[in-house]
Amino acid sequence: MPALSLIALLSLVSTAFARQWEVHPPQQQGRHWAQICSGNPFNRIRGCDRYGCGNYGASRQGKGEKHKGVDVICTDGSIVYAPFSGQLSGPIRFFHNGNAIDDGVQISGSGYCVKLVCIHPIRYHGQIQKGQQLGRMLPMQKVFPGIVSHIHVENCDQSDPTHLLRPIPDISPPFPQQDAHWAVVCAGNPTNEIRGCDKYGCGYFGAPRRNGKGEKHKGVDVICADGATVYAPFSGELSGPVKFFHNGNAIDDGVQIRGSGFCVKLLCIHPIRYNGRISKGQVLGRMLPMQRVFPGIISHIHVENCDRSDPTSNLERGKGESEMEV
């Protein structure tokens, strides 16, 4: 969808939302909400992409309007949790055109009132507890290819919810390391979740590659938002650069780590250096802008063992075990 069409829809949304406001309790200060989306333990807010920016008050082109909520990064299909305990009401329609993400719900309670949009809740009415599963993220890439998929989070009084979401800079691995498995590879993906399937293919080891040669995927694709911090999965010696495409595109970079009984190549990242020692969990670099090269793909780090064996078991970090409130 062209950016101008999105802008027009957002303008309609703001008008429609304004008509729905009732008297709500003031938003409390000094408290924090729970994790909203699995895979985003710090409620990281969307930056800027070709459709706009996700921060509160960001400019909305066309009518001089401002963004009245914040966009919390959430991969399509991810589990969504209740940020606080309260009463559900809905459905909440954002676009009023029946598209694939035109759904949402309101939660009112605990001194707060918020609308979470572009999700499909498990129900629209009744009580819900803080941290309880609320629903699933809808397929935003189907509607806006290449956007940073996100939940639109808007206080009912249109005040700024940013301080309640407590975004924290990615300065350290989000979870303690365990010797049995590799560390967290990408900030915002604490379980090293592997890319599923999109229009470009699938991310699991051995997935077919559509190149006409019957080849299989020789690594796994660990989900990682463009620009996210990347960590060393284990301690070892760096070497590189490692080029994947050999065409100089925006993601043609990477590095190899050898040590601790492992050898792996991490591609589509820009490392802080190509040589020297690195420790498990230490900052390794940044995810490169994959959306710029493959619009609409699930952005990811290509992780490939040097001997081309399957690294999946090393990456597993107990899905579902630490994805509630942090």
From Swiss-Prot:
Return the similarity comment.
Belongs to the LECT2/MIM-1 family.
Biological process, per Gene Ontology: granulocyte differentiation; response to antibiotic
Q: What are the record's GO terms for cellular component?
A: cytolytic granule; extracellular space
Instruction: Give the residue spans that cross the bilayer.
Output: none
> Where are the disulfide bridges?
37-74, 48-53, 113-156
Give the sequence repeat ranges. Answer: 28-162, 177-312
A single MF term (Gene Ontology): metal ion binding
Q: Where is this region: Disordered?
A: 307-326
The listed locations are: Cytoplasmic granule
State where Zn(2+) binds. Answer: 67, 71, 152
Q: What induces it?
A: By the Myb oncogene.
Record's keyword terms, sorted? Disulfide bond, Metal-binding, Repeat, Signal, Zinc
Tell me the leader sequence span.
1-18
Its protein name is: Myeloid protein 1
Q: Does the keyword RNA-binding apply?
A: no
- Describe PTMs of this protein: Substrate for arginine-specific ADP-ribosyltransferase.
Q: Which gene encodes it?
A: MIM1
| Keyword Disulfide bond among UniProt keywords | yes
